[in-house]
Amino acid sequence: MRYLLSAIFILGASSAMSFVFSNIDGGNIDTKKWEGQPFLIVNTASKCGFTKQYKGLQKLFDTYRDDGFMVLAVPSNDFKQELKSNEAVKDFCELDLGLNIPMTQITSVKGNGAHPFFKWVEKEKSFIPKWNFNKILISATGEIVE
């Protein structure tokens, strides 16, 4: 049933402003709130050679958030390089790296269990993350920027 509802939702999604993620702090992150703003969604991992890119994502967020640009980190263990719990990811990112960018709970980004946003990206652009720290830039109108 979950997959059927997910498929129905994806077929109806016409822009990136149609998705809700679970916030690592609890509650939800609704991309509809970012309507009219560009944003970057990045699948991340704490134990990856690319983890150092978090620093650049934080700088990007700090530089442009007052202009309405958002950055969303989506921790994923799809490539077996993420910590085992949301709490561990949150502590690592906040305490060890000093990050305060918006972040989801650990989320699947590929395969049958992928979050509806990533299924939508696959449908729209035939793009599936092949590794950690893939960046998906969304325009202020909710379209994927290539």
Could you say what each language-model-derived stretch is?
Residues 43-47:
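Amphipathic alpha-helical repeat scaffolds
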Residues 13-18, 130-131:
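A short, compositionally biased
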Residues 99, 107-146:
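Thiol/disulfide oxidoreductase modules built on the thioredoxin-like
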Residues 19-38, 59-64:
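A short beta-strand-turn-helix
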Residues 3-12:
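Sec-dependent N-terminal signal peptides
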Residues 35-39, 65-70, 97-102, 132-133, ...:
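Loop/turn elements at helix/coil->beta-strand transitions in domains of secreted/extracellular proteins
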Residues 50-114:
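Structural microenvironment flanking redox-active thiols in thiol-disulfide oxidoreductases
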